[in-house]
Each structure stands twice: as C-alpha cells, then as structure tokens.
Swiss-Prot record:
It is found in: Host cell junction, Host plasmodesma. InterPro entries: MPV. Transports viral genome to neighboring plant cells directly through plasmosdesmata, without any budding. The movement protein allows efficient cell to cell propagation, by bypassing the host cell wall barrier. Acts by forming a tubular structure at the host plasmodesmata, enlarging it enough to allow free passage of virion capsids. This is Movement protein. It holds the Pfam family 3A.
Length: 279
C-alpha cells in the first residue's frame, strides 16, 4: 500500500518539491488575479437585468487545470492517495440593495456543484432574500469535499449561484453580492454534519446617529472656539476664566472632544445598534 499509519497532511504525503509546486499553483500572482476576475472572491458582484443568473465557480479554470494535473501525476506515481479534493468549510455572502426599499424583487442564492448538470442547491441549502429585507448576511456549509475532476467538458467544483427575480422596470444593478470563502485542497476527503443555510438580516447603517447628540456637537464647537486666544470666541454658556492655569485645568479635567464621524464618537453613541457597514 502507498500509505500506512495515521492520517497526514498533503505536505507530509508528498515531497517538498511537489509541495512547492502546489503553493505556486494556488498563490502565484496569476492565480490570485484569476480568483478575483473569474470567481469574484472578496469583490462586489452586481446583479443587473442583463445578468439575471450568475454562476461563479470557487476555483478559476486555469487553477483547476493545474490542480488536476498536479494531483493526477502524484496519484499515478504512487505518491498521493487520490486525484485530489476541494474542501470549502463555509461560504459567506454579504448582500446589499442598490434600489429603494419599495422596489418589488428578490434574490435566490445557493451553493451548487458544477458536476450537477441541473445546478441544484447542495443539500437544499438555498436562501431567498426580498429587496425590502436587505442588507443581509448568508452562509453555506457543504457536507462533502468535491473531487477535482472533469465532467464532460466542465471542471467540477463548488459554485455560488445568484438568481434575480422581479425588479420590473429596473434594468440596472438592483443588488450587490460580495462572497468570501477559503478553499482547501487535499488528497483525502470527508463528509460533514448537515447544517441549514444561514440567513442574518442586518440593520442598515444609521449614519444620522453620529450627528444626533447635541453634546457631541457642543464639544466639537467648544474645542474649536477655545483654541482661539480671544475671549470673545468662547461659547456664551462657558464661564470666562482669566486665570490661565485654571483655564488649563478646566480643559484637562473635562473629557476630550470627539470629532463628528470619528470612531470615538461612534463608540460613545449608546443607543446605536450594532450594524454592518461598508459591505
């Protein structure tokens, strides 16, 4: 038998040279660029009327070709126990709308296996988001590792599928989907506990809350005006103190001013709910 004893990592199973080859396949500048341009890893994908169905593989075709050749050569030489598997613990998608809340439409998002000609959701993990529900975070957890193989002329791997429904009269972008994942490749595989697709509705970012506390505005104005040497620029309600040392003590003893829009001002806004911003 080619392998005996306890389970080992891919690096332990293969030579250092082949491990370096695998690193080059996955992390070369060209591979990283392809992950962005072909797979939209960490990038915002716009859902438009002329792109109502989007299928984004989690591995670029060139990388799939290189991985398939790498594992096959190692398997044929007796150095690896299989022709390779792709493992993705979780896919996380941040979804935001780019039209008003009264627009009638929805998005259907799920994870599929490109080896399935019908592109059905894996284990029924599928999420439908109506426009008025956005923004939202969704997640998928495949229950198996995907073999690195060719099915007909298709490279088999996991893919994020997004379908746009409705939005009559809206020809442009109605939603933005930003997907993140971390693919792993190994010569061994496993099955995993089934979990339903995650769906978390997120509060829209309340940017008005940063400007709604008068005390924050007052502190900002006070800090700006008190920097001027002339006493006529002091706020009317601030007691005039001719003693320079006492004035310095007054400034030092009070809380430092927080600029509107600064992180400190945001932290001191006690009634703000936790939100996701900048997706």
């Amino acid at each position: 038998m080619a392998f005996q004893g306890t389970s080992r990592t891919l690096t332990q199973q293969s030579s250092a040279a082949s491990s370096d080859d695998l690193q080059k396949i996955l992390f070369s500048p060209d591979a990283i660029k392809k992950m962005a341009t072909e797979c939209d890893l960490g990038r915002h994908h716009w859902m438009r009327a002329d792109n109502a169905i989007s299928v984004r593989p989690l591995v670029p075709q060139v990388t799939s070709n290189n991985l398939l050749s790498f594992f096959k050569s190692g398997y044929d030489a007796g150095e690896l126990r299989s022709k390779g598997y792709m493992s993705v613990p979780q896919v996380l998608c941040a979804v935001t709308r780019t039209v008003s809340t009264d627009a009638e439409g929805s998005l259907k998002i799920y994870l599929a296996d490109l080896g399935d000609k019908e592109l059905s959701p894996i284990d029924g993990q599928c999420v439908t988001l109506h426009n008025h529900e956005l923004p939202a975070l969704i997640s998928f957890q495949p229950t198996y590792d995907c073999p690195m193989e060719l099915v007909g002329n298709r490279h088999r791997c996991f893919a994020v599928v997004v379908e746009r429904h409705g939005y009559i009269g809206y020809g442009g972008t109605t939603a933005s989907v930003c997907s993140n994942w971390q693919a792993q490749f190994s010569s061994k595989n496993n099955n995993y506990t089934h979990a339903a697709a995650g769906k978390t509705l997120v509060l829209p970012y309340n940017r008005l809350a940063e400007h709604s506390k008068p005390s924050a505005v007052a502190r900002l104005l006070k800090s700006q005006l008190n920097n001027v040497s002339s006493s006529r620029y002091l706020l009317p309600n601030v007691a005039l103190n001719q003693n320079a040392s006492g004035h310095e003590s007054e400034i030092l003893n009070e809380s430092p001013p927080f600029a509107i829009g600064s992180p400190s001002a945001s932290r001191n806004n006690s009634f703000r709910s936790q939100v996701v911003n900048g997706l």
